[in-house]
UniProtKB/Swiss-Prot annotation:
Tissue specificity remark: Detected in the thoracic perisympathetic organs in larvae, and the dorsal ganglionic sheath in adults (at protein level).
Gene Ontology BP term (one): neuropeptide signaling pathway
Disulfide bonds listed in the record: none
Residues recorded with modification Phenylalanine amide: F9
Keyword Oxidoreductase: no
Localization (cell): Secreted
GO CC annotation: extracellular region
Keywords: Amidation, Neuropeptide, Secreted
Keyword Chloroplast listed: no
Superkingdom of origin: Eukaryota
Stated family: Belongs to the FARP (FMRFamide related peptide) family.
Principal subcellular localisation of the protein: secreted
Protein name per its UniProtKB record: FMRFamide-5
């Protein structure tokens, strides 16, 4: 999901 994609860091 795009919301969790920012947490891929």
């Amino acid at each position: 999901s795009p919301t969790q994609d920012f947490m891929r860091f």
